Amino acid sequence: MHKNLFDHVNTRPEAIHLPDGTNPDAADACAKYNDIIHSVGGIDLQLLGLGPNGHIGFNEPGEAFELETHCVDLTQETIEANKRFFDGNVDLVPKQAYTMGIKTIMQARKVLMVVNGTSKAEIVKKAFFGPVTPEVPASILQMHPDFTLVGDEEALSLI
């Protein structure tokens, strides 16, 4: 997050909060992260991408919409998609991750999703013009009062 985002934006270090990946107790790390979010009054802007199976964050298909930050087992598809961050070596990709839950994402005041490429066209159509279902986690964003989808022509070609 620092290398790809925080080092490139004008933000105070004390305003940056991430789940503590060094905490051996996943439930405690997630609870503390949720406490931080609540203590600062929630999230103003949630920036999201869209996974090939409709996941947002690491909320994979089938995850309950009512969850806050929690630890998840990553699907093989998500592991494969993230190997690019590990020099292409799938064996180096973690098999679990902390993720902000759908409940917390939906409580953000504004949600912005950025999509690009033809590989996202079908899932964009399914997520935003299909039924709201846990099988396509991003579909819940149809219900958000202030959601914006930004994408290139290819990603938006089917809508």
Predicted regions and their residues:
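Ligand-binding beta-strand-loop-alpha-helix segment within the catalytic cores
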Residues: 1-45
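ATP/nucleoside-binding phosphotransfer catalytic cores, i.e., glycine-rich phosphate-binding loops
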Residues: 103, 107-159
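Short, flexible loop segments at the rims of nucleotide/cofactor-binding pockets, characterized by
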Residues: 23-25, 88-94, 127-129
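Solvent-exposed alpha-helices and their adjacent loops that cap or buttress functional pockets
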Residues: 9-11, 37-41, 65, 97, ...
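A glycine-rich beta-strand to alpha-helix segment
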Residues: 35-63
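Class I SAM-dependent methyltransferase SAM-binding "motif I" and its flanking Rossmann-like core
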Residues: 57-102
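A short secondary-structure junction signal
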Residues: 28-31, 57-62, 67-68, 123-127
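Short beta-strand segments
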Residues: 19-20, 47-50, 113-116, 150
